[in-house]
Amino acid sequence: MLRFVIALSLFVFLGILNGNSQTKISTDSIQNKMQWFADAKLGIFIHWGIYAVNGISESWSFHNKEISYPNYMQQINGFTASNYDANAWAELIKQSGAKYAVLTTKHHDGVALWPTSASKLNMFESSPAKKDLLAPFYKALKSKGIKAGTYFSLLDWSYPDYPGFLNDSSRYKISDDPQRWSRFLTFLNHQLSEIMEQYKPDLMWFDGDWEQSADQWDASGIRKKLLSYNPNLIINGRLTGYGDYETPEQNFPVSRPQFKWWELCMTTNNNWGYQQKDTNWKTPYEIISIFVDAVSNGGNLLLDIGPKPDGTIPAEQINILKELGKWNKKNGEAIFNQLGGIAQGHFYGPTTISKDSTTLFLFLQGKASGQIMLKGLENKIEEIEVLGTEVKLPYKIVGKISWSKVPGLVYIDVPENVLDPYITVLKLKLDKPIKLYNGKGGL
């Protein structure tokens, strides 16, 4: 993942997205294949690689010369995967409520988790693991009905024919040696073919496209090649403009992104891969509130975990996923297969809407009890239910004037004893598809 997140990344993100991949790929042409992704809402990201051995930054630590390249690569000798249980991973992902998972097949360091024939720099040939780490995981995912995603770094700082290496030096310029670059593209496409043929992913999650242009990568050619294997393959937005959806990283947009499909990828602590010293864990409440906010704004959350070099998942991450799963089991009706919510200003919190627009879900963050307010609702409310319970709530209309078209304020009484430990969800059944008033008040 990218580490050079700058203070103004939100503005950069919004600016880039306004002119990036969505301008090259027609949303109408991919509407059907994107439906499962739009309904899925939650994915689990897994960063697993040799960087977990010393607990250092994945790839960037040698690129930025925090550690020498030889010392970085020596970590491969400690990567055992001795306690790797792909079925247990898949079961945990299922328990979380996630509908898809993305595993790092190869990060920027070039170390492949599968026995690629294009390079000996893989876990099968060069590490004590001596096994294909992808096959059992994707088999386990598919057995549980979870969509399979493959993270793949376009750039490869270890491959001798790739120009980039350290942050202040490069091997060559593409313009000076186009044949060498051509050899790298052959290598790149060979590995992509292996992944598509052997693991048949549902989603390709690219990274590392920023070092070269779309023409240099032959991004349109890569897209065409991948879709020849699977026309329904979903491709993320890090293919220099030739992806299907956008991928903001770590920073949550303040306003709703103006894109058909988007996915926030975020860590459970401060780092993507396993780092023993990083104990700054997000709480289950923080994760759930971020998740709800993403869904309310029409997006997905791709939540990251970083297994240890032996394949065990840190206890803190297991707890986060299980708590998230408990909440999803109770409140999933308001999340999965629903649409992003109503415009800001009508309700001070996240919302979602059913696909037929006759049900509105309100998310009460924190310990919100007493009266909550909904503004501008022109519909009649047939029933208000606390999701996951059989409790029905009373409400009243305040300020409705008979001669004015402006609807009154809806006040809902929420007793403390119905509150969820994390986020309470109210289900409002409406008399017809939702209609909101956005005009002026008064005369």
Task: Annotate each language-model stretch with its function.
Residues 22-443:
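Mature catalytic domains of secreted/periplasmic carbohydrate-active enzymes
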